[in-house]
Amino acid sequence: MILTTADTLGKREIIEYKGLVTGIIVRTPTITQGILGGLKNIIGGKNTSYTNVCKEARLHAEQEMINQAKELGANAIVAIRYDSSSLGGNTSGTEVFCYGTAVVVR
């Protein structure tokens, strides 16, 4: 599966547009990640616990989008965009949403 944030694929020709595909996931840190992340917030520095949660969430959302594209018979996704937001309240979760256009290229 070819993935790009660009609207075109250079020399490859888009021969069919299959439609919008999306991926969304909400991830919360484990208890250990939450404790380590909380300590890092106090002392400062790179917060690898939360960074890893965000990376994992992005990969899962992206995989969900890819699976949708495959179901449509696409072999590429163009114009991919990502968005994320943190959940407020008593949770420290992160929502990651991605979307793009599933296409067939040759």
Swiss-Prot record:
Gene3D superfamilies, per the entry: Hypothetical protein apc22750. Chain B (3.30.110.70)
Xref: InterPro entries: UPF0145_dom_sf (IPR035439), UPF0145_YbjQ-like (IPR002765)
Similarity field: Belongs to the UPF0145 family.
Protein name according to UniProt: UPF0145 protein FTL_1249
Organism of this sequence: Francisella tularensis subsp. holarctica (strain LVS)
